[in-house]
């Protein structure tokens, strides 16, 4: 989930010489974005055109010519697994760390698929109190359009409720590590040491600075990551969320919060005015679900040109 503390964790891990953590990018993974198999030289040119038309990937500062040459050295067909390995190798060519980490929080919902593509990979998930996540989201503005990352709390709470089904369905294993953000803030050194052991990394540090890799247009989202974690901000949500926001989140995700050791806060009964706001949250959420369903259904019943129009105009509101 956005604003869960993953950039702080990326900065802390990047301090170690064995580890390289990438920026996020909209890659053709066939999971979150349209996939693409590379089976010819023409496909390489097409994938390069696609990658270098994406601002997030351009921020990786990988030379197009160099990347093309590396892809030509790779056996066809090249799927997402092979492509990502080449991209990370090129991205960290100067540092040459032995552990390469691709940062993408949304992959938590697709672990089974990713395990098939990367059977030897390890996964790190950072868990944070959803009340704090939402509080941070509503104060942060997306770099692509300047809008708040969140404007009402139901989506954050609903996503948080999916975590037990996603995390706990995995059998006991040595490839998934769940780290609580609050533990990272309060006992960072010990938590990082445990994580290094999980990754098989040494404790040797480097002078690398993850903040320097972040594109200028995104730096405002991560202004504090160079500073030590602020323990006084861990529960700032308790004073900054409105009562309606707090009640909404706890009504939806209360069981999941307590399941992961987070205490619920007692609140007074909502006033009539606050109840109206609560109702509007649900009305807005229902409208969002209807629009999503309309986009999906139109794909099967409308001509392609009409579907693309519906997708373009309704997806703005999803």
State where each predicted segment sits.
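PAPS-dependent sulfotransferases, especially Golgi type II membrane carbohydrate sulfotransferases
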Residues: 168, 201-318
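PAPS-dependent sulfotransferase catalytic domain
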Residues: 77-90, 94, 108-109, 117, ...
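Anion-recognition interface
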Residues: 45-62, 82, 102-103, 108-114, ...
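Short, flexible helix/strand-to-coil boundary loops that buttress conserved ligand/catalytic motifs
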Residues: 23, 32, 137-138, 207, ...
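PAPS-dependent sulfation machinery
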Residues: 21-102
């Amino acid at each position: 989930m956005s604003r869960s503390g993953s950039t702080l964790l990326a900065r802390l891990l990047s301090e170690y010489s064995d580890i390289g953590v990438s920026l996020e990018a909209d890659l053709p993974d066939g999971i979150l974005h349209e996939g693409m198999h590379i089976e010819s030289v023409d496909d390489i040119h097409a994938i390069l055109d696609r990658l270098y038309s994406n601002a997030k990937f351009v921020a990786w500062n990988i030379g197009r010519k160099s990347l093309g040459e590396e892809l030509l050295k790779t056996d066809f067909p090249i799927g997402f697994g092979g492509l990502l390995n080449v991209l990370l190798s090129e991205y960290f060519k100067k540092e040459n760390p032995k552990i390469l980490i691709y940062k993408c929080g949304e992959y938590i919902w697709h672990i089974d698929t990713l395990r098939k593509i990367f059977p030897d990979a390890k996964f790190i998930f950072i868990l944070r109190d959803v009340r704090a996540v939402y509080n941070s989201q509503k104060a942060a503005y997306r770099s692509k359009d300047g809008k708040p990352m969140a404007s009402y709390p139901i989506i954050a709470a609903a996503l948080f409720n999916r975590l037990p089904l996603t995390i706990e369905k995995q059998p006991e294993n040595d490839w998934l590590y769940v780290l609580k953000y609050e533990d990272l803030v309060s006992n960072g050194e010990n938590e990082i040491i445990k994580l290094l052991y999980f990754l098989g990394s040494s404790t040797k540090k480097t002078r690398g600075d993850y903040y320097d890799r972040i594109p200028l247009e995104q730096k405002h989202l991560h202004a504090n990551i160079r500073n030590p974690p602020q323990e006084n901000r861990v529960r700032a949500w308790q004073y900054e969320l409105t009562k309606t926001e707090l009640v909404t989140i706890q009504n939806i995700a209360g069981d999941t919060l307590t399941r992961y050791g987070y205490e619920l806060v007692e609140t007074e009964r909502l006033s009539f005015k606050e109840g109206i706001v609560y109702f509007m949250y649900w009305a807005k959420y229902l409208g969002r679900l209807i629009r999503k369903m309309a986009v999906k259904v139109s794909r099967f019943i409308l001509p392609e040109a009409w579907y693309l129009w519906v997708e373009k105009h309704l997806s703005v509101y999803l």
